[in-house]
Swiss-Prot record:
This is Large ribosomal subunit protein uL18. One of its GO terms (biological process) is translation. Part of the 50S ribosomal subunit; part of the 5S rRNA/L5/L18/L25 subcomplex. Contacts the 5S and 23S rRNAs. It comes from the Bacteria. This is one of the proteins that bind and probably mediate the attachment of the 5S RNA into the large ribosomal subunit, where it forms part of the central protuberance. Keywords: Ribonucleoprotein, Ribosomal protein, RNA-binding, rRNA-binding. PANTHER family: 39S RIBOSOMAL PROTEIN L18, MITOCHONDRIAL (PTHR12899), LARGE RIBOSOMAL SUBUNIT PROTEIN UL18M (PTHR12899:SF3). Belongs to the universal ribosomal protein uL18 family.
């Protein structure tokens, strides 16, 4: 594994490091993020059962008209509120794991995390 690690890009190395840290916190629900230049996707995943409890993205009908193909702070707040709206209220009291993938914790990722924390998420 160590030899293969040397041939990976810095993006892939960061992704592997973050995934290894997430494995240590098994038993919690995971908030997974994917972003592109045009869209932002979020899922709340139960890894023990292998199911997705709730999801939200800028492709949803409620947000698509506001987003207009660009991801900014306003659309991030709307995606977080949509995720909270779709989540059962009993699940909101649990602790979560924030899976940022290979993305650095700056910009839109940190704004999304702060929006969730202000709504009552604990991670």
């Amino acid at each position: 594994m160590k030899r293969l690690y040397n041939f990976l890009s810095s993006y892939e190395k960061r992704k592997l490091r973050n995934r290894a840290k997430l494995d240590k916190s098994a038993g919690r629900l995971r908030i997974s993020i994917f972003k592109s230049n045009k869209h932002f996707y979020v899922q709340l995943i139960n890894d023990a059962k292998g199911t997705t409890l709730a999801s939200a993205s800028t492709l949803d009908d409620k947000i698509r008209n506001v987003c207009k193909g660009r991801v900014n702070a306003e659309t991030i707040k709307q995606v977080s509120s949509l995720l909270i709206e779709r989540l059962p209220s009993t699940k909101l009291q649990q602790r979560f794991v924030f899976d940022r993938g290979a993305y650095k914790y700056t910009g839109l990722i940190s704004q999304f995390a702060e929006a969730l924390r202000s709504s009552g998420f604990k991670f």
